[in-house]
Amino acid sequence: PNEVMTVDPVLYDALKKVSDANCREIYLGPLYASLENLCMSNDDAAAAQFDPEKDDDAAEEAAAVAAFAQNPDDISMEFPGENQVCLHVSDAYQAYAAEMGYTAYLDFFWMKNAFLIDYLADTIRGEGYQLGIISSKDGFVRCLDETGEKEYQYPLYHLSGNEIQSHGTMMYEGPKSIVFFHAYQAGSPDTYRYYQYQDGTMRTPYLSASDGKDHTAASELIVYSGEYGCADTLLAAFFDYQAESLSGELLKT
């Protein structure tokens, strides 16, 4: 931290985009590491040790990291230009990180594939390809088709109780970016990002910088855009998905 580094242009653009959107969740790197430990636990007792809703030490850690993450004086990014980035970290946060044994302050975590798919889409288009779909198993889709001559399908699901049920199909024409927020495991990449307790309680990767805990306004939310990529679509809707309830008016904007 506190040194200017030259990074790959793709990484620079991704960091700049997150910073411009004021998405402080990228600064929750230490808590994402704890969440991975929770999700890889073999039983509820082991998982609870990493759960701020069930363990006092975990709750104290989540609150501390969130407090640092919220405060630009404690952690922030500066972009001098020329693909240069400087991660500013306060002495207080560095001391706490050393005490806790943290190795990373930043992590895109569940957001990473949105940026990767956008990069692949831009690269493919740059080579002259204008058809096809790029998708990831954790809920990001880019349809490149600009002809308007073909109709595409996106399956819809809904969590009812503990059962994931099919709820039809969304038909669309390209180009389109689709982001699928979901409060349950929906694919193999979710294995290390979600954990379900025996009582049905689910922990998700949607941690908030407000308190370091996961928040979801609904069991699922599909957001799409014909103008923006997956990353911009994600950043535009993420805070609404973390609200106490979904606002249709906000999502329309």
Regions found by a protein language model. Name each.
Residues 1-253:
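Mature catalytic core of soluble alpha/beta enzymes
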